């Protein structure tokens, strides 16, 4: 019985040692942002998932999803970056990130992955910025609200 207890304690201790490595960014955690249609653009649901792994190969991973949008349409995803302006009240830098194509039901998904070098090239680390995502195509546009993103 004591062998089983010792083995169980070792497994729990090993798992606890692994968990901190999976926590990702200490300043900005993953965020799920709803997309809303601009005007009368069709949309059942949609979102942007902004994930900050903060690693050397994957600094950030964004997932874009449309459900019930225009069918068979190609959309461009653009990140509107408001440098050092977490309220998105000033001028934005438009950063195209991905292309998303919907199927016959108007559903589509795309991803963008940013490494540290890409983020450093923009000179935006160690600050808080406002970001709005837009997805546009076929005369329809979908947008998120402004969110403050702190990059370390």
Segments from the language model and where they lie:
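Bacterial N-terminal signal peptides that target proteins for export
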Residues: 1-8
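C-terminal segment of classical bacterial N-terminal signal peptides
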Residues: 15-22
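N-terminal leader/targeting pre-sequences
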Residues: 23-152
